[in-house]
Amino acid sequence: MRTAQRDAELTARAYGSGLWVHDTLADALTAAARDTPQREVLVDGPMRLDCATLHNRATGLAGAMLTRIPAASVVSFMLPNWHEAAIIYHAATAAGMVVNPILPSLRDHELAFILADADVRMIFVPGDVGGHDYAAMLQRVTAALPHPPVVVVVRGKPLTGQLAFDSLPTQPASAPALDPDAVRMILYTSGTTGRPKGVLHSHNSIHALIRQIGRHWLIDPGSAFLVPSPIAHIGGSIYAFECPVLLGTTAVLMDRWDSDGAVALLTAEHCTHMTGATPFLQAILAAAQRANTRLPDLRVFICGGASVSPQLIRTAADYFERAVITRVYGSTEVPVTTIGAPDDRDRAADTDGRPGIADVTIVDGEIRARGPQMLLGYLHPEDDTDAFDADGYFRTGDLGHWVDGHYLVVTGRAKDIVIRNGENISPKEVEDVLLGHPDIGEIAIVGVPDPRTGERACAVIVTDRPPGPDVGDLRDFLQATGVAKFKWPEQVVVWDALPKNDAGKVLKHRIRARLVDADE
């Protein structure tokens, strides 16, 4: 792993502004446990953790980690939004490990790649959730690895060679000195190459992000975040694990999305903040109307991660009269690139907001960004070559323009990514798997607008075995090959040929336009 490689001027500015500091998240948790030991940081159903309990359990688990794997190893967790994930996250940080959250919706195919690519040394998984046996999946996947990780099962029964979370010793050990500029988190993001890429963040890149949202989103000590978004995303992890320690908030976790349950939790726990992609806001608005509540405690709803309708923002802002409802834009690489428009109701609805600490520019229509919250780079340095321009700006692959010179509007993507319910799906990854189907000669997967999910994945197929496979056939094939369910196409059409240019490149923009026209 590496430390942050930044332009000297940018580094000096980040430290000078206080966005980068010489302390770490582990230092902050130690201070919180000392100064406010009984302050509640996490709510997970009936389980409530205060600062002292979180610190004690995290440092105890850190000791258990250090007795089994070396410092600076990669520690993964593949858990629902459970409080145990917070303990693991802070334990890995205190032990000087690199934490790697993994989506529980991934299956053998994706998991095997991540474990090998990041050389994961320890992984925490649930037993059985939603009818899926994670312990058995880990046994299958790790059997093929040359250096299998230690597998720890949370809320379930471990299989042979695996450990039970509750049986791990909790004796604190001497933790190594921590470098705030060193890598401490790897998050995998879908790439246009079809191969997921590991995004590297440091203590300080995340610290800068947290300080930014603390300044702009009406967050005070005692604010409470409802966290239904997956904690394996950078958004879910910062609101569940970072803000409670660094900003004095409380995280209220939801391990399974239910809009009526979310409204009940927002009310019972007096939640002041929530973030989520478009479907979350749509569902919360409908559920609140059914319950005849305007959620008087809600102060801020941050909406991003997928295409957002201006009318939805306006309707929600009218209904939740006390709340700021605003669009934002960001990525795993440069999280919270814009902070929304919390002080301008119109711009909050019809733009994606103004930049906060990020320096944003548009070159030939493409949005580029750099700043103290930017990734250190990708796990494999060769992936950095095309990701950054000569001035150190991250090439987002998204298209946009400015309104009034200050507010960004994202108009589309140059990158070939489908965003469904806020989840990035790499079409090429799924296409490569489906080309193994005997009835598929050619395939192109594109995202088409969907009022419920933002986008849906549509597979356009050329076959020499008419009528060709249907949606059910593709889903059966993808399930058998271990591809996560959220990546499965929801629509299949069969064409005689795919549109291509003279070089033979498939013209996905034409495919998308034809499908959209057919929907109208």
Where are these regions (language model features)?
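Gly/Ser/Thr-rich phosphate-binding loop
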Residues: 268-275, 285-347
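AMP-binding/adenylate-forming catalytic core of the ANL superfamily
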Residues: 63, 106-113, 123-125, 274, ...
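Conserved AMP-binding/adenylate-forming core of the ANL superfamily
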Residues: 19-22, 26, 30, 38-68, ...
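ANL superfamily adenylate-forming
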Residues: 7-8, 129-180
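Conserved ATP/PPi-binding loop(s) of AMP-dependent carboxylate-activating enzymes
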Residues: 354-357, 364-391, 425
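Conserved AMP-binding A3 loop
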Residues: 50-52, 184-208
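Conserved AMP-binding/adenylation subdomain of ANL enzymes
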Residues: 207-224, 232-273, 287
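Conserved pre-ATP/AMP-binding loop-to-beta segment of ANL
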Residues: 22-23, 37-38, 170-188, 195, ...
